[in-house]
Design a protein with these regions (language model features):
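C-terminal "cap" of GNAT-fold acetyltransferases
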Residues: 116-141
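A conserved beta-turn-beta hairpin within the catalytic core of GNAT-like acetyltransferases
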Residues: 46-57, 83-85, 118-121
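A short, internal acetyl-CoA/4′-phosphopantetheine-binding micro-motif in the GNAT/acyltransferase core
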Residues: 56-66, 92
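Conserved GNAT acetyl-CoA-binding A-motif
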Residues: 80-91
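Conserved active-site alpha-helix within GNAT-family acetyltransferase domains
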Residues: 94-111
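Conserved acetyl-CoA pyrophosphate-binding loop and the N-cap/start of the following alpha-helix
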Residues: 66-74
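Conserved catalytic-core motifs of GNAT/GCN5-like acyltransferases
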Residues: 90, 108-123
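Acetyl-CoA-dependent GNAT
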Residues: 6-52, 62
Length: 141
């Protein structure tokens, strides 16, 4: 089974930072997914504006974390709890697995930031609240 983890922000951010090389901003918020014994995934949010935030998902690579309750919690935070209109994903162009995963979640390709990384470009992805299939219909306005 498993459960969403809301406590222990520092531990969650540190775990995700190790997995995906994330450099946390001061405004970072984190939730995790645990199988009861081990942390399996973390969703990070940062770069908040009135309508948007950046969203980053880190996992242990096993697939044990990819559960509907975790995806619901991950998308309910920005769209239901914070009432944001969209989330943004910033994916290194070379990270084809992450890009494929994000597109499968429903993100749309919106642009390219050339030479944004020392050895790569960044692909900009966006997901609008009304496009998010993981939150209940009444919140997709």
């Amino acid at each position: 089974m498993g459960s969403v983890v809301y406590e222990g922000k520092e531990e969650l951010v540190a775990w995700a930072s190790q997995v995906i090389g994330f450099d946390p901003r001061p405004d970072v918020v984190a939730i995790g997914w645990s199988d009861g014994q081990k942390l399996r995934a973390v969703t990070l949010y940062d770069g908040f504006s009135q309508c948007d935030c950046n969203m980053h998902i880190a996992s242990d690579g096993t697939g044990f974390w990819l559960r509907r309750p975790f995806l619901l919690a991950s998308f309910a935070h920005p769209f239901v709890q914070w009432d944001l209109r969209r989330v943004t994903g910033l994916v290194p162009a070379k990270n084809t697995a992450a890009l494929r995963f994000d597109l499968h979640l429903g993100f749309q390709r919106e642009g390219l930031i050339r030479h944004a990384l020392p050895d790569d470009d960044i692909i900009v992805l966006g997901l609008l609240r009304e496009e998010c299939r993981y939150i209940p219909q009444q919140y997709r306005r």
